[in-house]
Regions:
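Conserved N-terminal entry element of GNAT/NAT acetyltransferase domains
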Residues: 1-16, 161-163
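Conserved GNAT-fold acetyl-CoA-binding loop/helix
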Residues: 13, 23-50
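A short helix-loop-beta-strand connector motif used in the catalytic cores of GNAT acetyltransferases and
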Residues: 49-61, 82
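Conserved beta-strand in the GNAT
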Residues: 61, 67-75, 82-87
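Active-site acidic-Proline motif in GNAT/NAT acetyltransferases
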Residues: 76, 89-91, 95, 123
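Conserved acetyl-CoA-binding loop-helix of GNAT-fold acetyltransferases
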Residues: 88, 94-107, 134
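Conserved GNAT acetyl-CoA-binding A-motif
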Residues: 109-121
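Conserved catalytic-core motifs of GNAT/GCN5-like acyltransferases
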Residues: 118-122, 133-155
Length: 163
């Protein structure tokens, strides 16, 4: 993949690359198969579901020229901005795309006067925990999916300086 400047933009009504976006998420989350239990909710996503998600939430895509290389969905909550489905194509992991999308989420939180970013990551994904910690997130809770008696995910938050 030729490296061009990465452009982060919001998903608007003109976005029509839903199948490509679904493929990106599935490929970015594929390494979790057989590692996390229960399996990732990404497996339940559909093209229609993603389009609905984009209408209900605020989506961002990362573009390398005309190539879709990342995405992030944000959902404003009462006291925070929830971040979900942060995905980067596997061959671009570690290239700063995720951090750039996080910066877009931080700008959105500032614009909405939301002082905290919140996300959830699976207990087993310790590399993700370390990455989010480097980005300023701290562990705030452990949660269990329905039917599980052990923690299956952790919540992490990042406090933002508003002003």
């Amino acid at each position: 993949m030729t490296s061009m400047p990465i452009r982060i933009s919001s998903i608007d009504e003109s976005f029509d690359r839903w199948e490509e976006l679904l493929s990106l998420i599935l490929s970015a989350f594929a390494y979790m198969d057989g590692v996390i239990d229960p399996p990732s909710s990404a497996h339940r996503l559909t093209v229609e579901g993603l389009a609905h998600k984009a209408r209900e939430e605020i989506g961002f895509v990362a573009m390398n020229g005309d190539t879709l290389v990342g995405c992030l969905f944000c959902r404003p909550e009462a006291e925070c901005l929830y971040l979900g489905k942060l995905a980067v194509v596997p061959e671009r992991h570690g290239s700063g795309i995720g951090r750039r999308m996080l910066a877009a989420a931080e700008d959105l939180a500032h614009d909405r006067n939301l002082p905290v970013l919140r996300l959830e990551t699976r207990v087993e994904l310790t590399d993700n925990h370390r990455t989010f910690a480097r980005w300023g997130f701290v562990k705030t809770a452990e949660n269990a999916h329905p039917g599980f008696s052990r923690p299956t995910s952790i919540e992490m938050q990042k406090r933002l300086a508003l002003g």
